[in-house]
């Protein structure tokens, strides 16, 4: 019985820790249909506007420069929130990424961004190097849009942590489920 209670406690703690995470929230604001989505390793072109969640103050915008930002996705050239939040995106798609400090700049001041800030980026995928731009952008209805990548990652993480917790519980039960008496002491 103690083993069961311990296992349930471990699973609950792990799940709460994962679900309480505010590292990355992805809202698809303009879902688009396409044959080819972004993947890690792609060089992509993105328009964006970055604001501080705390006060809505804009700290950067590629629209102001009239030039999209280009980088290799998943290569660590940008903050983790971008490397993960812009995967599986179609050309023409728009997303709002809400990025917690651990997926942003952490405890560092960076230009006008205070340490520990949660960032909000309105993003638009303008292009993927080597992938022709579609002649027209076909939007999806909100009901056709897939679940956000962040939600899928949370489910995946909870499953992973639950599996690890179950393995620990099995080990504990195996170690304490010894019915043989040890009178050596």
From Swiss-Prot:
The gene is FPR2. InterPro entries: FKBP2/11, PPIase_dom_sf, PPIase_FKBP_dom. Its EC number is 5.2.1.8. Pfam families: FKBP_C (PF00254). Inhibited by both FK506 and rapamycin. It comes from Podospora anserina (Pleurage anserina). A motif (Prevents secretion from ER) lies at residues 182-185. One of its GO terms (biological process) is chaperone-mediated protein folding. SUPFAM superfamilies: FKBP-like. GO terms for molecular function: peptidyl-prolyl cis-trans isomerase activity. Residues 1-20 form the signal peptide. PPIases accelerate the folding of proteins. It catalyzes the cis-trans isomerization of proline imidic peptide bonds in oligopeptides. GO terms for cellular component: endoplasmic reticulum. It is found in: Endoplasmic reticulum. It comes from the Eukaryota. It catalyses: [protein]-peptidylproline (omega=180) = [protein]-peptidylproline (omega=0). Residues 41-129 form the PPIase FKBP-type domain. This is FK506-binding protein 2. Keywords: Endoplasmic reticulum, Isomerase, Rotamase, Signal. Its main location: endoplasmic reticulum.
